[in-house]
């Protein structure tokens, strides 16, 4: 279960039920408000003085109409044409007064008004002085976003749910498709649909800066966006150039399969002639699952109907590599669970660098049970129902291995392009078929590094296969039970380091992430079969998804780590000897960075993601003697919006629970007042190795809750989450839900003791694993601390989730039945002690099946528990998007939370009928 993040990409636009009904008030800037406030006071004084100085000011006697008439005049924008303070009866009443009385009243009123005016002027001057000296008059547009701010400066517009759902707060970001030149040139990128350029161009990254004189000339690969074949027009949505840049593989008519995989029609485009031909000559409309170039640019391997084929360029001949592909046997592409949990990709094919061999995964899921996904509204297959079946839902059967069920059997196969045969290499000591996961495949010259684990991911073997001799051996075996009792996370970042004796590398090797110093650290293994590495990093921090790049010319390894702080990310470099680790990004300031390197590591796209306004720039790296820097994105519009809006005040810190320091962020409403008592919404994900508290810029749903609704929103990353040390991570092994919920409850009790918190209005919410944790926390707390909860697409019993993810943390139900029973959400009586909770789920969720929510509902029914609301979404998967569903999710969360904190749900228990209204009397 990869962390489900309700990022801006996840949110969809729609009707805002909390739209401001007086938009002009919010559109007004602070400067306008300040001007109007000051000028209104002046206008009042000017109006009084104007009337005092004119003949029209003829005060009346002391009858009861005077005050009302004065107020009416001061509030009237239209000047009267008759006597000031006059009305229809003024002449008749004034005729009854004596001239002497009128003059005495005039002087008396004048004296009184001057005294009052003097006092008001003095008060106004003093107030103006204080106002100006405090600089509180400054409009929000004068204050740049300050992530360190602990108070709100000025005033501004409110953050709205519409803005969040419409991605108005999403930082603009760019990605670079780095590509090596035909002769190995570094710093080239692939640009599609550039302004004023051909459709697909290879360009020197330095050409992005108009003032650069070093940039090489760009090369157009595809000039026109559309192409024609057999009198039909096509548009390529995917373009993949060959390494020699002479051909481009095009994909049209792309249709998604699962999270990463898709089907498409493929074409070969010739750069020189700008002509196209179908990849499958005899079947122009053939829909393929995968196609990939040989590194030598002379062949393409593809998968169709789960069988693999090879086409050599310059020939229409198709060579069939496998013949056993079927609905249950996959070649070169993963099945559902391997795509979702192991490869995080639709690709299970790997070319050797010399183009002589193809390694591929063969997956046999014959023994894997099926799970039906029902579609009641749509027909994702695109097929029309058979006559008489129009009123039945479409059902898609997925081979889905739940915890403890049969796993797919995987084997790594090799195809020898020259010999034309498929072979495998048997290695002694391998895991049994139903106890084997193949998690990573890396070519190392003529050899292949293969990582495999047992099915519960606590024993790993690194296997080295020589495809020339067709032999292999295990070069490293690690039992994590002997280290800390945890598990191995899957990684695809192992980097092959070829030998270069002249450059100080006598043997081939590889850089990998291993368990060291209570965390994940980088290690360099050389030669390939050496089980003892050179440690490149060590200490009380961790590397993140490392390494990022390797500079083979200068023996430098680049990586991202938490060295400065567990909630920050900075980029570093270190030599392959483990010496001279230095930062690439500015560590003197807080920062959360991501980085993308060119193929030769001489250039990089640096992405600053927070805590201030995000920006991006391309730089030359320490590997490049020619200095270069170009700002790609500054997000000026976002910075301007941040100035004009009242954003939440984000307070970061740690809370100590059972001797463990846990990171938190508390989002406070603008103009936070410590003398008030605020409701609190706890938002969390809490999944193993995940992280939600981090120093990034984000205006998301949680920000809206704080800045738009005026509640406090807290996130605490409890034990089991990432980057707080393996000791605090692996404590959850075999017992999911216990420590995570314990930490959320402890945090809630801590906040409940704060003077500015309303302890009777605490709620918690989450999606996916966060939904599970919401329910588990409510169950464990039983209404003592949390009163409300909102769970979206939750797991409720880990026996219902997929085997590879679940067993990594829980082992199998056969060996840990007590742990599975404890981890399930089953205590309906405890849930009944909460005031109320909300449950939402997509009916067509292929990841966390609807079975989870339905089973919980049945348990609640059996105990006659009714303090909950349910909303299901037909045909929606785990993201819940179908037919405006995502918008409704967040509308529902908002409305439900407001009702909860307003006490509406307190009125539901033991509801009694109101008295009947009397019928209106009939009219005559």
Swiss-Prot record:
Active site, per annotation: 768 (charge relay system), 845 (charge relay system), 878 (charge relay system)
Enzyme class: hydrolase
Transmembrane domains' residue ranges: 112-132
Pfam families linked to this entry: DPPIV_N, Peptidase_S9
Catalysed conversion reaction: Release of an N-terminal dipeptide, Xaa-Yaa-|-Zaa-, from a polypeptide, preferentially when Yaa is Pro, provided Zaa is neither Pro nor hydroxyproline
GO biological process: proteolysis
Enzyme Commission number(s) from the entry: 3.4.14.5
Keyword field: Aminopeptidase, Glycoprotein, Hydrolase, Membrane, Protease, Serine protease, Signal-anchor, Transmembrane, Transmembrane helix, Vacuole
Protein localization: Vacuole membrane
Gene3D superfamilies in the record: alpha/beta hydrolase, Dipeptidylpeptidase IV, N-terminal domain
Domain of life: Eukaryota
Vacuolar side, ranges: 133-924
GO CC terms in record: fungal-type vacuole membrane; plasma membrane
Ranges annotated as biased composition (Basic and acidic residues): 9-23, 47-58, 92-104
Residue positions the entry lists as glycosylated: 231, 364, 827
Compositional bias per record (Polar residues), positions renumbered to this chain: 31-43
Membrane topology, Cytoplasmic segments: 1-111
Keyword Oxidoreductase: no
Topological relation to the membrane, as annotated: Single-pass type II membrane protein
Molecular-function GO term, any one: aminopeptidase activity
The family this protein is said to belong to: Belongs to the peptidase S9B family.
Protein name per its UniProtKB record: Probable dipeptidyl-aminopeptidase B
Organism expressing this protein natively: Sordaria macrospora (strain ATCC MYA-333 / DSM 997 / K(L3346) / K-hell)
Taxonomic lineage from the root: Eukaryota, Fungi, Dikarya, Ascomycota, Pezizomycotina
